């Protein structure tokens, strides 16, 4: 399944362009914590309306800056509130993803906090199995307890470019692999191979 992910870095007509390229799904940036405040992506509403109008399934991602458990819970509440207020409380078909790549979340004590935030959101969303983690291959290996990740079967969306295979999937088939971001197309547009939930 050909899935792209987009944010306010992309031009206003990007959804139409991706549909023309054969997109089968799109993951939209919901927001990011900026200057300590959870903030809605400036093009989210436009893009989600475009995707719905195109009849494509979509997911959402949130770029975390959480420095501690309180930060994760503030972000979780923001995500929950936006899904309720903007999406009518309907969980996106292609999932809800914690984007783990910014400095504050690159720390040795991040995993228990991220795990507990996801488990809390699962309890809010009727035991949802579509709340997952997006990160680079190196991040999963350095900061995530892979044994627990497999135990909880939290969905995995891994970024790894320039390889002939998804190395995390090959090395850890026990994980719940959902997607592989395999290229940025020269930093113009992220593209993913979607395995599904």
Language-model segments: what does each one mean?
Residues 1-8, 16-20, 24, 145-197:
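Functionally critical loop-and-helix segments that line ligand-binding/catalytic clefts
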Residues 1-123:
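Substrate-binding cleft of extracellular glycoside hydrolase catalytic domains
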Residues 35, 67, 140, 165, ...:
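Flexible, glycine-rich phosphate/dinucleotide-binding loops
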Residues 49, 80, 85, 126-127, ...:
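Detector for Asparagine
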Residues 59-61, 132, 157, 180:
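Structural detector of well-ordered beta-strand residues that form the stable sheet scaffold
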Residues 92-170:
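Catalytic domains of cell-wall/extracellular-matrix polysaccharide-remodeling enzymes
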